[in-house]
Amino acid sequence: MAKKVVALIKLALQAGKANPAPPVGPALGQHGVNIMAFCKEYNSRTQDKAGFVIPVEISVFEDRSFSFITKTPPASVLITKAAGIAKGSGESAKGSAGSISTSQLEEIAKTKLPDLNCSSIESAMKVIEGTAKNMGVSIKD
């Protein structure tokens, strides 16, 4: 018989840098989860993705054990890294914050495909292109 899930916690943490300080400690502590065990396991799973923010979904079971799934970095983070900018434009309709090539767009779409609700690279590219345009990042051929 499967264990009963009592809580689902979603956090976005720096890869390889989870520690018991907020937001991790309070989020897990209120459900009675071993915080250090989570931090060690998360850091070991994400150490190869240093520099990225990695979203994580933690399932807490009734016996206070847990399991978690790491996701791919947010599209906005991948776009800003590819464009070489600190952040997107505050007014995307007026000014451009930077640009990325279609090959970079395709690479980001391939990275994000498992987490997107689409099945083909072409549709994933359209989703990522929309995110880029909202950030004021243009797509160059």
From Swiss-Prot:
Protein's UniProt name: Large ribosomal subunit protein uL11
HAMAP family: Ribosomal_uL11
GO molecular function list: large ribosomal subunit rRNA binding; structural constituent of ribosome
Keywords: Methylation, Ribonucleoprotein, Ribosomal protein, RNA-binding, rRNA-binding
Gene name of the encoded protein: rplK
Biological process per Gene Ontology, one example term: translation
InterPro entries linked: Ribosomal_uL11, Ribosomal_uL11_bac-typ, Ribosomal_uL11_C, Ribosomal_uL11_C_sf, Ribosomal_uL11_CS, Ribosomal_uL11_N, Ribosomal_uL11_N_sf
Single GO cellular component term: cytosolic large ribosomal subunit
Species assigned in the record: Prochlorococcus marinus (strain NATL2A)
Function: Forms part of the ribosomal stalk which helps the ribosome interact with GTP-bound translation factors.
Assembly: Part of the ribosomal stalk of the 50S ribosomal subunit. Interacts with L10 and the large rRNA to form the base of the stalk. L10 forms an elongated spine to which L12 dimers bind in a sequential fashion forming a multimeric L10(L12)X complex.
Pfam families on file: Ribosomal_L11 (PF00298), Ribosomal_L11_N (PF03946)
